[in-house]
Each structure stands twice: as C-alpha cells, then as structure tokens.
Amino acid sequence: MGEMLNENTSSTSLSSFYVLENETIFNVQEEMEEDGSESGNIQKTLLEDPCPENVNDENEDEQNRSSRSSSPLVKHEQRHRMYNLKEVIKSFILTKSKEKPCDLEMGIDSIEMGRMQSFESDQQESHTGQANFPTDQEDPRNPQLDSQYEAFITQGESQTDKKKTSTVQEEELQNAGKKLETVQENPQAYSKVTQQEPQAGQKAVPQEPQANQQETSSNQEESSFDRQETQDDKQKPKTTQQEHYNLRNRNQATITNSNSKPQTRRSKIFVISLLGYGVYLLAFLDLIEYVSKEYGFEATVSAQIFLWCLFGVLMIARGLIYLALFRNFLNILKRMAIYCGACFWVYACIFFLTRVFCFLIDTPYPQFEKIPLEIYSIFAAINVYIIELGAIYCTSGR
C-alpha cells in the first residue's frame, strides 16, 4: 500500500509540475512582451509559486508531504523546471538584449556551468542514490577572496578620499588667488565690502546675536589686516618696468633700490672705457701724423683708416667679452648684431654731423684737407665714446 501511495503521489506531482511549468513559462512570456522588463517580472512569477507544494491536494498528510519533498525524483523535477525557465530567459535575452554582448556571454556561461553541475549531481545521485548538497557546516566562502575584496574596498576608499582632499585644496587655492587679484585691483573697494559685511550679517540674522558678534569680530580683524596691507603697499616705493625685469631675471623676492645698482655699474664701465679709449686715441694720433708725413697720405685718409681699425678692434674686444660671459653662440650673435647696429648707426650720425660742420665753415664736403686734424680727431673721439655708450646701454641688462 505504501508503494502504491508513493507511485500515485509521484505521478500526481509530475503532472502538477508540468502544468505549473507551462503556466509559469506562459506568464513569463506574457509579462516580458507587455512590459519589456527582464528581471522584475520574472522574479514576481517565481515568487508567486516558488515551490510546487501549493498544487497538491489539501487532504494530504504531513507524512506524504515529507516523503514527497525528500524524494530525489521531486528534486530532479524541480531542477528540470528551473532550467526550463533559464532556457526561456536565455532565448529572450538572445532575441531582445543586443546592446550588452559581454553581459549576455556571462549569462550564457553561468547557465552552462549550472547545467554541467546539475548533470554531475544527477550522475552522483544515480550512482549513490543520495543528493550532493552542501551541509550546514561547510562554508562556501573563501576567506582569501574575502580579505582581498576588503583590501580592494579600503584602497578604493582611500583613493577617493585623496581625490576629494586634492580637489578641495585646488578650490581653496583658486579662491585665494581670485581674492588676491581683487584686492590688488581695487583694495579700497574690498576694504569697504569687508567693513559692511558685519552690519549686513547683524541685520539678516537677529536671532543669533552671539554668532553674529563672532562673525563681526572676525570680519573686523580681516578688514583691519587688509587696511594694513594696503597701507604697506602705499608706503612702498613705486617700481619701474626695468626693476620688474631685473626681479624676474634674478629670481629674487625683494630688492631695495634696484635701480641704483645698474646705474652705478654702467657708470663705472663707461668711465673705464672713456679712460682706455682716450689713451688709445692719443697714441693713434701720433701714429696718424707719422704715417701722413712718411708715406704722404692725407690726414683725413689716415684718420678714416684709424677709425675703421678702431671699429675692428672694438668689435673683436666685444666678441671676446661676450664669449667669456655667454657660452651660448646664438646669444653672442644677437648681442654682436645689436652692437654692430649701434656702431654703424652712430657712425652715420657722425658723418652727418661732419657734413653739417663743413656746411657751417663754408667748405665743400669732399675737401677734407681743409679740416684740421685736431677737429677730425675730436669727432673721432666723440664717435668712439657714443658708440661705446650705445653698445653698453643696448647690451647691459638684457
């Protein structure tokens, strides 16, 4: 009798399982076609009838229920029903979700792995007659993976905290830079705004007098500090463009009386050059007189030769000085070009002045023999001094 009851219950349970399976699949397909949602409706249909026990007759005894639920055939039918549902979901995903191929492949792989595991468990049940289910004592989690996951989470949180702090610091620096720019552009207006801030705070929030008093005191301190800064800026001497240029080149924070140092340096160089070239001219005047007497050259021709030789010597000396000071070849060429341009420009000016002088003394320009040698030597000396002064001014400090 017991065997007959078990067979009847198993047959009724099989028929009820097949009916339930068809109903759930039909419900899943209808809800997917109506709503278009993939996960919520499937969960609803599965939650409505999670187990086939609700289909059984109400008159069954508890013994029949326990024996039916513990039988391996019932468990096999449950697995079969669940994997049929997975096949329906898989077909639906293959037809409708084409936007995420990676998720689709992962879902298909997980379904295939589950199918292989179920096949292995069915084989074990067929050999041993017992289902291979994990016991309560076995822990499926891996402690190494848990520790790695916790370390990964803490590392990500620390990185996000660092990013937040860096962004906050950048915003504070930008706000401070904007505040400094506004103070430098219009310090008086900024001081007025800081003076008016506590009054506006007192009027706006009369319910909190202590907080307003603290805000007004802090605002007054800031306004007094801003006033002191503006007064210090006013007391400082105004700097010129050349001083700003020197500050930028030398990378110095503060330089007092920076305009006096280049002037003293230039004056020293100019005095030394005057003395040196004065002696140079006196020596060459005797040489010009000797050449003009011995070889029959005119004084003007010998003076012109002297000037061109002097230009050559000056350019060679300048080139050696620049080579000692500046090792960069392009910088040397640039400074020599400035020096040569200054030399030829001043030389043209000197010849223009000589023509004006010839016009004033009523002599034609080509007749240089009527011009005394002393006057021509004076012009030559002035020429040399102006050239040296222009070269010093053009090349020093640049």
UniProtKB/Swiss-Prot annotation:
Q: Which organism is it from?
A: Schizosaccharomyces pombe (strain 972 / ATCC 24843)
Q: Name the gene behind this protein.
A: mug126
Record's GO cellular component terms: membrane
For region Disordered, the annotated ranges are 30-81, 119-260
Instruction: State the UniProt keywords alphabetically.
Output: Meiosis, Membrane, Transmembrane, Transmembrane helix
Instruction: Report the record's disulfide bonds.
Output: none
**Transmembrane parts of this sequence:** 269-289, 305-325, 341-361, 373-393
Membrane topology term reads: Multi-pass membrane protein
Task: Name the job this protein performs.
Answer: Has a role in meiosis.
Q: Where is composition skewed (Polar residues) in this entry?
A: 119-135, 183-199, 248-260
Compositional bias annotation for Low complexity: 210-222
Q: Where in the cell is it found?
A: Membrane
Please give the biological process terms from Gene Ontology that the record holds: meiotic cell cycle
What this protein is called in its record is Meiotically up-regulated gene 126 protein
List where Basic and acidic residues composition bias occurs.
Answer: 224-236
